[in-house]
């Protein structure tokens, strides 16, 4: 976006904020309450005013405080400087903005800006907003509209160092929002005209800050507030305001332009759960617009109000949270009233007597069938709003006229909802046979026996695992792994010759899967039929069998993992949902949960489900630890962050963004694909059990969270991956791709035999006292200019006795920095790919930002990183013999060959690392309880190979490899592969040390655990 467009957008947002405030004051004859810190209307205003004043600053960290002190009276400056909770100039800038709003003097200050352009150019770049005469004039005109609006803002607010407004979780629950404090006249008959005024005067401009930053209503501030003060990017010359003080772009705002807009995760109440939320926060619903929307829907067909129909649509778009709609009734049932579906059956039963009446607010005859549900929405929503009105949330009661046109008194509906009708007449209509029973779950019976709440437990497993026969952009189809496996059938994706033949004959494994799939579908249909019988009969006396089924579903609902049969494709007898555990699950205690709530969670009262240890880049040889955090709103992908913010949120994916989940070959990877495939995230599991555990946890989180059916498909055919792998194997084996059979595919660590053949090397991590391990001249990044240009300087670096010293020059004796590489001060080193200079790497420090260094060549950089990593792992690597470096890679086993290779996950291009013939293997050696094996090769083979040491992720993966090896070897020699135990103590110790190093190294790859595997992560 060009600089002029960015500035125009900022001023447009200010205009909308001011007009919104003016609309309240214009529509009210009584005295309007003062605006306070916690009011949402202040968030919008201060957010955009702060944008305007920050745009183009040369020094963002100082804010505009350095400028406004020249124009501000001495008493005000002293008042701001002595604030106890504001510690930075950026925070003082916003405190000054609050003071100017309190005094209604912001317009006067901007006039001083106009008269002192020379002073402005001292602190702003030339294309700043306040340095543009036209933009500053318009800015001043807009601000003049705030002259008669009363503000009572507290200046001493601790969040001002980080944001121009109060984060949601800072807001006291007992304080009413500005809209709740408005006089009743604003909520009454003037509501429609108020919103119409806002819509007309806004000239059809949306509340869209996507060019600048997400607005305060589009995301929660939880992921930004505790961090270092984030300020707008300084790419003023490029005209792109990529980051703002308000925080990173929210993923929800990226989807506003897509056709199938998703529901905001802010509304986490599942509409299919009967229990309503006890309180509704002001961030979830705005009472003024809730009531006005109902009134507008009731009056939409009146000829006098026809001119406001456009405004009604606009208000709905602005205040409703969009989602993928299955029907009109679903659309109206949930967005503003998450709990209103508890009365849905009553509304449907009431609507049966009015089938012939016109649908409310609908012009298309196609929606006539939905009229019974639609007509009931208005009164039920209004009634529910009045029922939930509490002293903490004053929702004004208003008269609803929509039911009067339909001949049904509102009092009857209220009586029915309050349980004053005969239970035998409740829910008189069964839902259509093609409708999922989750979308039409019954509501509260008037006099329900103390049974389980079956509307909360209906998870409709078939809605989640929609067995897609063909994945997008695939050539051939494959079977779904999540079909329940039969006796003797492997749980992994079939890749044996028999499975390949079945795929060719049955069109992707149809010979195996139809019967279990039909059985599962039949079970779901039978359960749905039982539910229909329950709806048709009196609810107070359901059948005993149905009680057991529904109670079982209810008992399963709170469990983080669903049943094995539903989720992971294994038989029911293999464990209950509560027993589904995996060693990669990280148990979060209260301290860690507090860290997550402060640094990660985006929503108020966001609930944690699972924290799972996974990784990325394994198949490419660039293994990095990743924590996958599942809440009721998002899938968070976490890396190790800076000291001030221990968790770095690499990505937050809303459940409503997920389109489908693709499982890789032999379930070694899981790919999350968002709507329109705009974002894809490949996660390494390297373990079949972990993949199943993750998928079960993901489904459970979505069902209990904000995602509504239909759930994302699970694609398990891995067709494209199979084709790419077959092509690679065919090229290496010099055969046709159709003749390739893959017996095993896994993500492993492999000791390169070329390094092993060189023999053991002395360990450099513990040099003799007084020796210098490494020294030399390097460049280090000294800072970054306001335009983003990096400044690099030379320095002399010495690594001695495990301590890294940085000197300005070779002749200096006083170091600029000294770091104990083996202690808590350092967390490791890694290659830096985001700098301007080549051959750059980072030394990760615990008490300050990373030290970024740059070498003259790739070889020099590799040598430095090797020495630094050895120094960091001093406490892990045993003294004496250092294990050979292990390469994270893919291991592929075919009918006659073994391959180790790297795979580019973007292009599916394979690069071979090592090849061996299966027939050349003479024996396999293992250690009981350890997840590694040694492949011994025959000495009389044509190609003499040293032993291969292969480390896997767990013992179950080792068993899978050994089974595939034995099966392939037996096919060749008709006898079992010789299996021995590792006898030599030195080798056993060496392998175990290497395994320990792998476990700690994949943590240290992102400075996890400060280089100590025994510590909890990121404490």
From Swiss-Prot:
GO terms for cellular component: endosome membrane; lysosomal membrane
Primary location group: cytoplasm
Name by which UniProt lists this protein: Pleckstrin homology domain-containing family M member 2
Effect of residue 830 to D: Loss of interaction with sifA
Keywords assigned: Acetylation, Cytoplasm, Lysosome, Membrane, Phosphoprotein
Membrane topology value: Peripheral membrane protein
SMART domains in the record: PH (SM00233), RUN (SM00593)
Biased composition (Basic residues): 315-327
Domain of life: Eukaryota
Modified residues (Phosphoserine): 441
GO BP term, pick one: natural killer cell mediated cytotoxicity
Annotated ranges, domain RUN: 36-158
Gene3D superfamilies, A to Z: 1.20.58.900, Pleckstrin-homology domain (PH domain)/Phosphotyrosine-binding domain (PTB)
Pfam families given in the database record: PH, PH_PLEKHM2, RUN
MF terms (GO), sorted A to Z: kinesin binding
Annotated Basic and acidic residues bias: 516-525
Region (Disordered) location: 230-458, 471-525, 557-581
């Amino acid at each position: 976006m060009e600089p002029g467009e960015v500035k125009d957008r900022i001023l447009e947002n200010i205009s909308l904020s001011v007009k919104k405030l003016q609309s309240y004051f214009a529509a009210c004859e009584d005295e309007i309450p003062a605006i306070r810190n916690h009011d949402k209307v202040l968030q919008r205003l201060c957010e955009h005013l702060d944008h305007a004043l920050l745009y183009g600053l040369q020094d963002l960290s100082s804010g505009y405080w350095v400028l406004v002190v020249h124009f501000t009276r001495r008493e005000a400056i002293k008042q701001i400087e002595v604030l106890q909770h504001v510690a930075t100039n950026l925070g003082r800038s916003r405190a000054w903005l609050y003071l100017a709003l309190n005094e209604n003097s912001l317009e006067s200050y901007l006039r001083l800006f106009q008269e002192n352009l020379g002073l402005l150019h001292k602190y702003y770049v030339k294309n700043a907003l306040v340095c543009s005469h036209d933009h500053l004039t318009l800015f001043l005109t807009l601000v003049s509209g705030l002259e008669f609006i009363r503000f009572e803002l507290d200046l001493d607010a601790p969040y001002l160092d980080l944001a121009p407004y109060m984060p949601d979780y800072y807001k006291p629950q007992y304080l009413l929002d500005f809209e709740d404090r408005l006089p009743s006249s604003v909520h009454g008959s003037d509501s429609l005209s108020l919103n119409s005024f806002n819509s007309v005067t806004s000239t059809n401009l949306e509340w869209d800050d996507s060019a600048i930053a997400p607005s305060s209503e589009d995301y929660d501030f939880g992921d930004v507030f505790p961090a270092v003060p984030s300020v707008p990017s300084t790419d003023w010359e490029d005209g792109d305001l990529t980051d703002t003080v308000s925080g990173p772009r929210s993923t929800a705002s990226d989807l506003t332009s897509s056709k199938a807009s998703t529901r905001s995760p802010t509304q986490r109440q599942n509409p299919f759960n009967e229990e309503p939320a006890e309180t509704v926060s002001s961030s979830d619903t705005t009472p003024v617009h809730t009531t006005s929307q109902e009134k507008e829907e009731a009056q939409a067909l009146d000829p006098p109000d026809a001119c406001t129909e456009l405004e009604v649509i606009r208000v709905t778009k602005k205040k409703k949270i969009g989602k993928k709609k299955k029907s009109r009734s679903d659309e109206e049932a949930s967005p503003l009233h998450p709990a209103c579906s508890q009365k849905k059956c009553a509304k449907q039963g009431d609507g049966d007597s009015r089938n012939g009446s016109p649908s409310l607010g609908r012009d298309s005859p196609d929606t006539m069938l939905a009229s019974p549900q639609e007509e009931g929405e208005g009164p039920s929503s209004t009634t529910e709003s009045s029922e939930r009105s509490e002293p903490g949330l004053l929702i004004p009661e208003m008269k609803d006229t929509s039911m009067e046109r339909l001949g049904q008194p509102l009092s009857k509906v209220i009586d029915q909802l309050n349980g004053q009708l005969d239970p035998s007449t409740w829910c008189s209509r069964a839902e259509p046979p093609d409708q999922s029973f989750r979308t039409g779950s019954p509501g509260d019976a008037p006099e329900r026996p103390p049974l389980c709440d079956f509307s909360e437990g209906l998870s409709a497993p078939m809605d989640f695992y929609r067995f897609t026969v063909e994945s997008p952009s695939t050539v051939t189809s494959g079977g779904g792994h999540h079909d329940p496996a039969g006796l003797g059938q492997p749980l992994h994706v079939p890749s044996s010759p028999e499975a390949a033949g079945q795929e060719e004959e049955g069109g992707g494994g149809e010979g195996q899967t139809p019967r279990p799939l039909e059985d599962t579908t039949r079970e779901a249909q039978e359960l749905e039929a039982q539910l229909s019988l329950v709806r048709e009969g009196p609810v107070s006396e359901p059948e005993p069998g149905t009680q057991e089924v529904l109670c079982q579903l209810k008992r399963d609902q709170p469990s983080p993992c669903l049943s094995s049969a539903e989720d992971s494709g294994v038989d029911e007898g293999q464990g209950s949902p509560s027993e589904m555990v995996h060693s990669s699950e990280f148990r979060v205690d209260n301290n860690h949960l507090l860290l997550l709530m402060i640094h990660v969670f985006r929503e108020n009262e966001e609930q944690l489900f699972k924290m799972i240890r996974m990784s990325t880049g394994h198949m490419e040889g660039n293994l990095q630890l990743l924590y996958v955090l599942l809440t009721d709103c998002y899938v968070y992908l976490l890396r190790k962050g800076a000291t001030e913010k221990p968790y770095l949120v690499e990505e937050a994916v809303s459940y409503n963004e997920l389109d489908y989940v693709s499982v890789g070959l032999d379930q070694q990877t899981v790919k999350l694909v968002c709507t329109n495939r705009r974002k894809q995230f490949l996660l390494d599991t390297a373990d079949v059990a972990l993949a199943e555990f993750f998928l079960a946890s993901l489904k459970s989180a979505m069902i209990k969270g904000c995602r509504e059916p239909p759930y994302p498909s699970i694609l398990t055919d891995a067709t494209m991956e199979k084709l790419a792998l077959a092509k690679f194997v065919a090229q290496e084996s010099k055969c046709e791709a159709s003749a390739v059979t893959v017996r095993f595919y896994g993500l492993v660590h492999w000791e390169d035999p070329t390094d092993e053949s060189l023999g053991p090397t002395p360990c450099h991590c513990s040099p003799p006292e007084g020796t210098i391990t490494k020294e030399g001249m390097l460049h280090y990044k000294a800072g970054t200019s306001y335009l983003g240009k990096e400044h690099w300087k030379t320095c002399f670096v010495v690594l001695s006795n495990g301590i890294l010293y940085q000197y300005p020059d070779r002749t200096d004796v006083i170091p600029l920095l000294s770091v104990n590489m083996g202690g808590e001060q350092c967390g490791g080193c890694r290659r830096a790919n985001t700098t301007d200079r080549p051959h750059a790497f980072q030394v990760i420090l615990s008490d300050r930002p990373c030290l970024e260094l740059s070498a003259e060549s790739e070889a020099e950089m590799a040598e430095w990183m090797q020495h630094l990593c050895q120094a960091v792992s001093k406490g892990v690597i045993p003294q004496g013999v250092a294990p050979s470096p292990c390469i994270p890679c893919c291991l592929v086993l075919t009918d006659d060959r073994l391959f180790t290779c790297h795979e580019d996950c973007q292009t599916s291009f394979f690069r071979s690392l090592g090849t061996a013939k299966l027939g050349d293997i003479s024996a396999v050696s293992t250690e009981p309880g350890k997840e590694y094996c040694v492949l011994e090769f025959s000495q009389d083979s044509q190609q003499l190979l040293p032993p291969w040491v292969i480390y896997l992720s767990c013992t179950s993966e080792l068993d899978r490899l050994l089974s595939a090896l034995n099966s392939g070897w037996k096919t060749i020699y008709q006898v079992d592969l010789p299996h021995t135990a590792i006898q030599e103590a030195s080798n056993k110790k060496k392998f175990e040390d290497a395994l320990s190093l792998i476990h700690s190294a994949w943590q240290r790859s992102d400075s996890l655990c400060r280089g100590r595997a025994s510590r909890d992560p990121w404490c």
